[in-house]
Swiss-Prot record:
Binds 1 heme b (iron(II)-protoporphyrin IX) group per dimer. CDD domains: catalase_peroxidase_2 (cd08200). It catalyses: H2O2 + AH2 = A + 2 H2O; 2 H2O2 = O2 + 2 H2O. Its cofactor is heme b. The keyword Nucleotide-binding does not apply. Residues 10-20 have a biased composition (Basic and acidic residues). GO terms for molecular function: catalase activity; heme binding; metal ion binding. The active site is at residue 92. The record marks 88 as: Transition state stabilizer. Keywords: Heme, Hydrogen peroxide, Iron, Metal-binding, Oxidoreductase, Peroxidase. One of its GO terms (biological process) is hydrogen peroxide catabolic process. This is Catalase-peroxidase. Bifunctional enzyme with both catalase and broad-spectrum peroxidase activity.
Length: 729
């Protein structure tokens, strides 16, 4: 950028400005920097959970409702009530979640940051957030934007007569976009290059169109085809962890409120917030049609309300949709929408801004899809026959939508947390016994090391248990010992036969220990699996000449199969794990192995340095997958914690030759003799090829670095083992 003499900002469109732009094919290690950097203003001395508990929660809700019912001239409320606008804001804040990789969702308050703040589907939600600013300003850091954006939708529903299922706070704010999220391959908004010839949606995406939360309301590819739309709805909502019943409840319940806005075509709209002139102060979509607000508002390009009481909870949406026939036409905004064929619904809805006028209701293609698709239709007909069941289904689905990315219930804050445990929260039981102490820990370590389980097997078992964790939605991890349950125990990445033996041995130790106790001290299998990894690492370090103690904190418990949603956990199956040098035959994404490694490291909340030291340590411990067949184990001293991996990788006495045209596997040869010394994968060689990883490898491969390597490995290992220990925060 160059500042012109007139004070304007000139954009450079073609000249590369960053290393990534100069070399776009290089591995994007930078996404791991966000796990090391705190770009917020609190300097690490702020505990949001503690601040939230000091909040006058009921006063906050009252203030939100007052804002909601006090129309402002600069952005007049439809029907005198901002409730429907706030519901849309909350829905779109949470609705970016996708279950494939757990990314997106309401955490972080990312709707106020690029790119989400400028997505076309979020048009005019900048006004909703500005309306809430006085509330945020009043309560300061006691309420995050992330919590406020979704709480506002709950309060909106309650103010319009709906009883919600509850609400939990605890979402902290981000102050920069999450660069790890793949929003799609397109380079233009409202395009759909994410489908293949079989109409299958790319992984890990949930939305079907760039810049939209779910699907195109006009229909797929702006085609008003309800049957095709139903297919897209099912795919998109399914990727966001919703089944058919939850999906139908969300659409029917959400569309009970408010209206859509398309007073004219979008040619009257100026730039979105990120591209708007500086004097607009972060507001976008300046509208030059009429007054640019109120009845002249342009948002989606579709115009009209769904029901005759847009600010009341009732059965109007289902009654109108099911009782009347609807025909497609283009509305005043130039978009496809549906109008009633019958004259009975002519003018039955008060105008949103002029009480002397009336308008007709409308439906979206996505609404008509619920009526045309036989499975959805059966559900919505049942909802209409059973209003209480509909209300309960919507309340539960709405709660799930808002909280799906928050992880287990123990992270929930506030007085409205529901008592009921829900299976999608991945519940684990409370400990009903006393925990093991130092004496018992030492006894159990000794018992573990006396078995036939090798250092490698113990490390791999602990890693397989803990590394399912995803920091994106706080799911997975060692707590619960779900590695012994379906589906985890049969995942190829976990080497099922060997895992079964390890679990059998560890379960035997657990039983013998617990049966022998005459007090209330017991050990869970979840703790014992992690402790086995600790014991193995301590032995491996000792065998390399280092005396270390791996920190261990008991307190994990064992979940049951009944507490485990098998289908939901399938998404946590590792299709690639560079730490174990593993990649499935059918990985869900067309990435290179090193890209999978960085993605996995990011989900584990690891920094570049932690990623580097963990890979080197896992190789030294011979903790690679059996599929790897020794690839990456650059040491003559396997199962000892040494830095040979880095020493041999960086040795210029070696050269690296691909063994196949696809350059997935390599042989490391002695330059002078041609002798093959080691075998490597792309994941291994990236630590010598990528400049950032090489710089870190050189630290750990130095002559004086072995002690630092061991200490850093233990620290990074302990971090992974405790990622899901929210009780320790």
């Amino acid at each position: 950028m160059h500042n012109g003499s007139n004070g304007s900002v000139e954009q450079r469109d073609s000249m590369p400005e960053t290393s990534r732009e100069w070399w776009p094919g290089s591995l994007d290690v930078e996404i791991l920097d966000q796990n090391a950097q705190d770009v917020g203003p609190w300097n690490g001395d702020f505990d949001y959970a503690e601040a939230f508990q000091e909040l006058d929660y009921e006063a906050l809700k009252e203030d939100i409702e007052e804002v909601m019912t006090t129309s402002k001239d600069w952005w007049p409320a439809d029907y005198g009530h901002y409730g429907p606008l706030f519901i849309r804001m909350s829905w779109h804040a949470a609705g970016t979640y996708r279950t494939t990789d757990g990314r997106g969702g309401s955490s972080g308050g990312r709707q106020r940051l690029a790119p989400l703040n400028s997505w076309p589907d979020n048009a005019n939600l900048d006004k909703a957030r500005r309306l809430l600013w006085p509330v945020k300003q009043k309560y300061g850091r006691k309420i995050s934007w992330a919590d406020l954006l979704v709480l506002a939708g709950n309060v909106a529903m309650e103010s319009m007569g709906f009883e919600t299922f509850g609400f939990a706070g605890g979402r902290e704010d981000d102050f920069k976009p999450d660069e790890s999220i793949d929003w799609g391959p397109e380079d233009e908004m409202e395009t759909w290059g994410r489908f293949n010839e079989e109409d299958e949606l790319d992984n890990p995406l949930g939305a079907t169109v760039m810049g939209l939360i779910y699907v195109n309301p006009e229909g797929p590819e702006s085609t008003p085809d309800p049957e095709w739309s139903a297919q897209r709805i099912r795919k998109s909502f399914g990727r966001m962890a919703m089944n058919d019943r939850e999906t139908a409840a969300l659409i029917a319940g959400g569309h009970t409120f408010g209206k859509v806005h398309g007073a004219d075509t979008d040619e009257h709209l100026q730039a979105e917030p990120e591209a708007a002139p500086i004097e607009q102060q972060g507001l976008g979509w300046h509208n030059e049609h009429g007054s640019g607000k109120g009845g002249d508002t342009i948002t989606s390009g579709i115009e009209g309300p769904w029901t005759d009481a847009p600010t009341e909870w009732d059965m109007g949406y289902l009654d109108f949709l099911l009782d009347y026939e609807w025909e497609v036409h283009k509305g005043p905004g130039g978009a496809w929408q549906w109008r009633p064929k019958s004259d009975e619904l002519k003018g039955v809805v008060p105008d949103a801004h002029d009480a002397s006028e009336t308008v007709d209701p409308m439906m979206l293609t996505t609404d008509v899809a619920l009526k045309r698709d036989p499975d959805y239709r059966e559900i919505i007909e049942d909802f209409r026959e059973n209003p209480d069941a509909f209300e309960d289904a919507f309340a539960r689905a709405w709660f799930k939508l808002l909280h799906r990315d928050m992880g287990p219930k123990e992270r929930y804050l506030g007085p409205e947390v529901p008592e009921e445990d829900l299976i999608w929260q991945d519940p684990v039981p409370d400990a009903d016994h006393d925990l093991i102490g130092d004496e018992e820990i030492a006894e159990l370590k000794e018992a573990i090391l006396e078995t036939d389980l090798s250092v490698s097997r113990l490390v791999k078992t602990a890693w397989a248990s803990a590394s399912t964790y995803r920091d994106s939605d706080k799911r997975g991890g060692a707590n619960g010992a779900r590695i012994r349950l379906e589906p985890h125990r049969n995942w190829e990445a976990n080497e099922p036969p060997q895992l079964a033996h390890a679990l059998e041995v560890l379960t035997g130790i657990q039983k013998n220990f617990n049966d022998a106790r005459t007090d209330d001290v017991r050990v869970s299998l979840a703790d014992l699996i992690v402790l086995g990894g600790s014991a193995a690492i301590e032995k491996a370090a000792a065998d390399a000449g280092h005396d270390v103690e791996v920190p261990f904190t008991p307190g994990r418990t064992d979940a049951t199969q009944e507490q485990t949603d098998v289908e939901a956990f399938e998404y946590l199956e590792p299709k690639a794990d560079g730490f174990r040098n593993y990649i499935a035959d059918d990985p869900w994404q067309d990435w290179t192995p090193e890209e999978f490694l960085v993605d996995k490291a990011d989900l584990l909340n690891l920094t570049p340095a932690e990623t580097t030291v963990l890979v080197g340590g896992m190789r030294a411990l011979d903790a690679t997958h059996e599929q790897a067949d020794g690839y990456g184990v650059f040491t003559d001293r396997p199962e000892t914690l040494n830095n040979d991996y880095f020493v041999n990788l960086l040795d210029m006495g070696h050269e690296w030759d691909p063994v196949s045209e696809d350059k997935q596997h390599f042989k490391i040869r002695d330059r002078d003799t041609g002798e093959v010394k080691w075998k490597a994968t792309r994941v291994d060689l990236i630590f010598g090829s990528n400049s950032r990883f090489r710089a870190l490898s050189q630290v750990y491969g130095s002559g004086d670095a072995e002690e630092k390597f061991v200490d850093d490995f233990v620290d990074a290992w302990t971090k992974v083992m405790n990622l899901d220990r929210f009780d320790l925060e």
